[in-house]
Amino acid sequence: WMMEFTEKMIEKICLDVNGTTQVKVGDNIIDFKAPYKRVTMLDSIKEHTGYDLTGMNEEQIREVCQKLNMEIDDTMGKGKLIDEIFGEFCEGTYIQPTFITDYPKEMSPLTKIHRSNPDLTERFELMVNGKELCNA
């Protein structure tokens, strides 16, 4: 319900302030009309890198990072590696409002475990114009 609440709230604010759901930001026209697209984090990574990290362990993800020519170090665990991949290859591509969902539990250890997959969490971030707008 929180994603629905968030998108409806933002849509209403845009309408009340601007009289439209569309906002020009630089060269982009952002349309805040609900509903917003929803993409899982791992699907986003697969779409933008070609690598499916589902079920991979830390060492396998480390190998993917090396294949992607990323700068990583030994202090980075599984969650940090996934976060780095997403940040470098995916985050900046979301111009229109998009909820990124189903974060790996290693990235959010204090977040509620996903209702159907214990390796994921019930978390989302709203990406707009290549940036994180909110996180819940």
Residue ranges and their predicted role:
Residues 1-4:
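Catalytic palm subdomain of template-directed nucleic-acid polymerases
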Residues 9-131:
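Metal-assisted phosphate- and nucleotidyl-transfer catalytic regions
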